């Protein structure tokens, strides 16, 4: 036993690492355990921050976007062209609206310009046509007037239906008048005064024998009616152009369903 103890002491003495100045080499550094454990903790799944609810909601909404919204991010050539024409239409209509308000450059001429538009209103034309129909004594005159009355009623119903469907506002905030409410001419597209002026002008040029100066004046009247509606800020330029086109097709439709003299006499007698 003493021999074994002496051998163990000699072995420890011979081992250089057991000396006091080398004991620190056998022990791991004090700061190494914590970084490893902290790194191990950081790499673990339990320490990952939970995803924010806002980010998850945005990703969910982006996955549920309809195709129309995705297509708006990459508009087609037709969409770009349409938006460009629409912007030009609004800009030009606002520039031509020189009588749109009291502070406009031509505000003093607003009453006169508005009077030009009233010459193509539906109520005066329907009332005047009925009055002429009552006083007419010829079959040919009654036939023309009855078909003109049909065309005017068709124009009012067509314009009111399209305006109710489109519901486009004018370039300026202008409230419709009492006569506009009676004819349901509330919105901007299409321009009812312009369609009526075009239809009546074409009707008179086709069924009345007029001199050349009167024909020119009739065409100028229709053009001035459309321009007056833009000047007072009631319609856009495209509204007036569309009104002219609709008025022409209304005339063509009345020509197709033209009522004969016998039909007109039957309706007059029933009335």
UniProtKB/Swiss-Prot annotation:
What is the membrane topology listed in the Swiss-Prot or TrEMBL record? Answer: Multi-pass membrane protein
Residues with the Phosphoserine modification:
43, 62
Q: Classify the main location.
A: nucleus
Q: Where is this region: Interaction with MTOR?
A: 70-91
GO molecular function terms here? Answer: sphingosine-1-phosphate phosphatase activity
Similarity comment: Belongs to the PA-phosphatase related phosphoesterase family.
Q: What protein am I looking at?
A: Inactive phospholipid phosphatase 7
Q: Which organism is it from?
A: Rattus norvegicus (Rat)
The taxonomy runs: Eukaryota, Metazoa, Chordata, Craniata, Vertebrata
């Amino acid at each position: 036993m003493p021999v074994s103890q002496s051998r163990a002491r000699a072995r420890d003495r011979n081992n250089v690492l057991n000396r006091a100045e080398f004991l620190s080499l056998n022990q791991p550094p004090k700061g190494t355990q914590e970084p490893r454990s902290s790194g191990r903790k950081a790499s673990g799944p339990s320490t990952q921050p939970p995803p924010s609810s806002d980010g998850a909601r945005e990703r969910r909404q982006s996955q549920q976007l309809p195709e129309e919204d995705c297509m708006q991010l990459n508009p087609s050539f037709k969409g770009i062209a349409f938006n460009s024409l629409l912007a030009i239409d609004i800009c030009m209509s606002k520039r031509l609206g020189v009588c749109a308000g009291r502070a406009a450059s031509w505000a003093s001429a607003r009453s006169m310009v508005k009077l030009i538009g009233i010459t193509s209103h539906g109520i005066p034309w329907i009332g005047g046509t009925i009055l002429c129909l009552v006083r007419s004594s010829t079959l040919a005159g009654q036939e023309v007037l009855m078909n003109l009355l049909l065309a005017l009623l068709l124009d009012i119903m067509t314009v009111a239906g399209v305006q109710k469907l489109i519901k486009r506002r004018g370039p300026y905030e202008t409230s419709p008048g009492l006569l506009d409410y009676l004819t349901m001419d509330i919105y901007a597209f299409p321009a009812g005064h312009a369609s009526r002026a075009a239809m009546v002008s074409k009707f008179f040029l086709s069924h009345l024998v007029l001199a050349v100066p009167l024909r020119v004046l009739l065409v100028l009247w229709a053009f001035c009616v459309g321009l007056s509606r833009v000047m007072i800020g009631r319609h856009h330029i495209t509204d007036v152009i569309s009104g002219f086109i609709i008025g022409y097709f209304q005339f063509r439709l009345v020509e197709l369903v033209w009522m004969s003299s016998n039909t007109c006499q039957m309706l007059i007698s029933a009335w």
